[in-house]
Amino acid sequence: MRRYHKPMLFAGLVSLLLLSGCTNNADDVIQTSIGEVAQAIGDTVKDTASELGDQFKRTGVHKEILLSQEIGSSVSVLKLENEVGNIEVKGTSGDKISVSATIWSLDKSSRDDKYQEMMDNAEITATVSGDQLEINMHPKGDEKLDMWRWAKKEYGFSNFSIDYVVEIPNTLYSFNISSEVGEINLSHLKGRYDVHNEVGSISIEGAHIQGKSNVGSETGNIKVAIDQMDDDSRLEVKTDVGSIHANLAESLQVSLETDSEVGSITGAPRGTSDINGGGPLLSLSTSVGSITIK
């Protein structure tokens, strides 16, 4: 979502509330009601995207492409960027990275043969540069070409998505993951998180946070389940429109910062507080949306 859309959305929501007669205790009403609206928006973004995706995936042309590759001990950073589609990354034992990428046609026209031809000309590479490994799907023979722009130029369409399921060894400890439209799901990863989404939800399970980490979504809910944070680490979680749910391990020691411009905060006071005596910084903030800490 472009930055100028946020104040427009905020103004529209406030106007809607005022027009409906919600003038008593306006501040409380706006905080609560818009927070609920933001939660609904986040849920709707996730549910609608999932339902539409599932609908097309049940009937559309698709192709799965697999990659398994050993990586050296010098590689520590995973980079994966996606325009449209879901990303799932999970930790595993061993010294190989495994990738399953599925291209899905989102077009119900009669061009199935063209979509199949496009998919047959796609491949995945995992390119190592220094300490970074980048996963990329591209047309065969040209790793630098973007799939969507290439398909638009070659076939006249770009109405497809790419879903990634990636398993990585625990020698990788920095995760640069981004998506424009789609869900991001990360599980059981130890390291530094740099995760961003424009439209769609983010879910992180079993996280062990190291270093300075950031997780953000412009439109969509964020769920983080944190098992551990190193003493010198910090984690900032932010969404423009959508809710944040943080599940913290019972023994986790953190210094918590919470802020919501418009929306409720439950499970911790607004502002700063210490959990289990304090520790590394955990910052949770929303522009429009609620925050829940458990």
Question: Which residues are covered by each model-predicted region?
Answer:
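Short, charge-rich amphipathic segments
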Residues: 45-56, 187-196, 215-221, 236-238
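Solvent-exposed beta-hairpin/edge-strand motifs
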Residues: 104, 119-121, 257
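Right-handed parallel beta-helix
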Residues: 65-73, 77, 86, 90, ...
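Short, surface-exposed interaction patches in beta-rich subdomains
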Residues: 205-294
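Solvent-exposed coil/turn segments that connect beta secondary-structure elements
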Residues: 83, 92-94, 102-106, 129, ...
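A generic structural signal for short beta-strands and their flanking turns/coil linkers
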Residues: 95-97, 131, 162, 211, ...
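Short acidic/polar N-terminal linker immediately downstream of export determinants
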Residues: 3-7, 11-15, 22-98, 104-111, ...
